[in-house]
């Protein structure tokens, strides 16, 4: 027995030609949470620089991660399309953001603040890191409401979900495995892993508490950032085994996804940062 995707309207409300969408709303509440939690952490840790500059820092990182996320998606996932449809670069409401690109954008912003205010970049990233998982989880809920980024076909998984708008992608699976046609006829679409919910739990909830409890004690500079890179990379690589690869890319060499390739350097960087932070002389 499979689970049917609930009928969720991705639009909250519409006023004239303008529609407010849940996906965009998730970005708003993520930023508001980061602002609230960041100020709370800055007061608790008595970091005066953060108290005075936290709003500018978070506004800048939010903007940098959004721009980086968009550029990253274009470069990593769909460059051929956007190179021929330049105006579509600005159609953010159509989707198309990359976490890895957003991370690069955030690092660039933090590097600027590090230079301007004579702070170590890892001091800034250790402060920012606990604010990230909430946004990741909220983003995946937005993806779920949009019924996008669903997982791979899994007819033997009892808790697989039927996503009605996966039908076009289902045709490719049925072409490879004609026996799946019966399932499609019976349920209207093929059963798939609800990987948005997997990512919500692992990258949003679990990663938040890992970072939260780890950062409650004083830690060597960089260790919080390193821990985040390691666990996010591991969680993302794991989930990619269940997530449907982007159709324009598919599996690279029929083995690995782009998300896994981009996550591997995160784990390596995290291990190096953790080692240097915890075992430096």
From Swiss-Prot:
The keyword Cell inner membrane applies. Its EC number is 2.5.1.145. A 1,2-diacyl-sn-glycero-3-phospho-(1'-sn-glycerol) binds at residue 140. It is found in: Cell inner membrane. The keyword Repressor does not apply. Pathway: Protein modification; lipoprotein biosynthesis (diacylglyceryl transfer). Coiled coil: none annotated. The chain crosses the membrane at residues 11-31, 57-77, 89-109, 121-141, 194-214, 222-242, 255-275. Its main location: membrane. It is an enzyme of class 2 (transferase). GO terms for cellular component: plasma membrane. One of its GO terms (molecular function) is phosphatidylglycerol-prolipoprotein diacylglyceryl transferase activity. GO terms for biological process: lipoprotein biosynthetic process. It is a multi-pass membrane protein. PROSITE patterns: LGT. Keywords: Cell inner membrane, Cell membrane, Membrane, Transferase, Transmembrane, Transmembrane helix. It comes from the Bacteria. Belongs to the Lgt family. Catalyzes the transfer of the diacylglyceryl group from phosphatidylglycerol to the sulfhydryl group of the N-terminal cysteine of a prolipoprotein, the first step in the formation of mature lipoproteins. This is Phosphatidylglycerol--prolipoprotein diacylglyceryl transferase. It comes from Buchnera aphidicola subsp. Acyrthosiphon pisum (strain 5A).
């Amino acid at each position: 027995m499979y689970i049917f995707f609930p009928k969720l309207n991705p639009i909250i409300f519409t006023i004239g030609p303008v529609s407010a969408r849940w996906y965009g709303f998730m970005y708003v509440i993520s930023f508001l949470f980061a602002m609230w939690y960041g100020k709370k952490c800055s007061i608790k840790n008595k970091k005066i620089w953060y108290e005075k500059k936290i709003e500018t820092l978070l506004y800048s990182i939010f903007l940098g991660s959004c721009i980086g996320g968009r550029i990253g998606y274009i470069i990593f996932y769909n460059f051929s399309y956007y190179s021929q449809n330049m105006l579509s670069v600005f159609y953010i409401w159509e989707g198309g953001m990359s976490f890895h690109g957003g991370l690069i954008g955030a690092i660039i912003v933090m590097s600027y603040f590090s230079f301007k205010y004579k702070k170590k970049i890892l001091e800034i990233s250790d402060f920012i890191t606990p604010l990230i998982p909430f946004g990741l989880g909220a983003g995946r809920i937005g993806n779920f409401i949009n019924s996008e980024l669903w997982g791979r076909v899994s007819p033997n998984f009892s808790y697989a979900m039927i996503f009605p708008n996966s039908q076009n992608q289902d045709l490719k699976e049925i072409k490879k495995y004609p026996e799946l046609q019966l399932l499609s006829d019976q349920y209207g679409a093929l059963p798939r892993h609800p990987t948005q919910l997997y990512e919500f739990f692992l990258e949003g909830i679990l990663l938040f508490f890992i970072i939260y409890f780890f950062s409650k004690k004083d830690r060597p500079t960089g260790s919080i950032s390193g821990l985040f890179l390691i666990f996010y990379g591991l969680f993302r690589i794991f989930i990619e085994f269940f997530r449907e690869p982007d159709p324009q890319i598919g599996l690279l060499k029929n083995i690995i996804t782009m998300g896994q390739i981009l996550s591997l350097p995160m784990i390596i960087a995290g291990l190096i940062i953790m080692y240097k932070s915890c075992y430096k002389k």
